Amino acid sequence: MAACVPPGEAPRSASGTPTRRQVTIVRIYLDGVYGIGKSTTGRVMASAASGGSPTLYFPEPMAYWRTLFETDVISGIYDTQNRKQQGNLAVDDAALITAHYQSRFTTPYLILHDHTCTLFGGNSLQRGTQPDLTLVFDRHPVASTVCFPAARYLLGDMSMCALMAMVATLPREPQGGNIVVTTLNVEEHIRRLRTRARIGEQIDITLIATLRNVYFMLVNTCHFLRSGRVWRDGWGELPTSCGAYKHRATQMDAFQERVSPELGDTLFALFKTQELLDDRGVILEVHAWALDALMLKLRNLNVFSADLSGTPRQCAAVVESLLPLMSSTLSDFDSASALERAARTFNAEMGV
């Protein structure tokens, strides 16, 4: 975490009463498949003060997952799949345990989002506005509530029921959110995973392939919504998601980012499954409401892609080059100071 909130005495009104000093904030969520290098990129951005403005970095909540409670979530979710594959755990039981672990991944992100979202400010500014403060979050809650659960569902590790339960917990994003989905060629991605050798983490090529596809779906979903379309546009013509769809979604780079995506390129397509439809093939209203909510929660996210194939400093520069295209919000000095305190606390408590 780099420099603190811009110093300075709060301005005063004509009567001499202190007024609330305004602070322009750009917030960035670095996201993508695990092991690409986003955490290193975020730390470098904070240490170098991206774009010349003070930068606060909120890391992955690793301690929350690994040491604060009785079970290591990262080791646990991989161990569950191993036990299932070895025949030591029934498929249905494994799915329930996987859903439990996945919900624990999301808890600290939801807590952090709830704590910080009221501090961002409500007024969205013109893109390209020079920020007084840059916030870099290591993942958005969409990762643990939508993307990773969707991948687990496509792999057969979680049920649609569990996926819907997770998706429903995604918080609505206030105006001004910017998510950067990080990418990397497969060979370098695997090399970096082997180099970091995180305890309990496994290099699961099929999971990696599925996550890559799901993140392309996320990018396409944000583009789709930004174009003014809704999930009902083309729903009737969309084929029902079936075993062939799931198989395709587990193949390396079967999905790609589309500038003008169709509904079938988005996350919404995987929800057109018999489990959510009535006997006529019509989606039940309660499930339609869930997709309406997902649409509204994602609508305020501006999505970008960034290739992290360079050095850490080069990767940070790639993300920083997107700053002029990003949305910002107008907050105040007290809120900015509260964000700085939150970042310091989160860094101190979440490190392992």
Swiss-Prot record:
Gene Ontology BP annotations: DNA biosynthetic process; TMP biosynthetic process
Enzyme Commission identifier(s): 2.7.1.21
Catalysis performed (reactions): thymidine + ATP = dTMP + ADP + H(+)
GO molecular function: ATP binding; thymidine kinase activity
Keywords for the protein's UniProt record, in alphabetical order: ATP-binding, DNA synthesis, Early protein, Kinase, Nucleotide-binding, Transferase
Xref: Pfam families: Herpes_TK
Classification via HAMAP family: HSV_KITH (MF_04029)
Subunit structure: Homodimer.
Record's protein name: Thymidine kinase
Source organism per UniProt: Equine herpesvirus 4 (strain 1942) (EHV-4)
Lineage: Viruses, Duplodnaviria, Heunggongvirae, Peploviricota, Herviviricetes
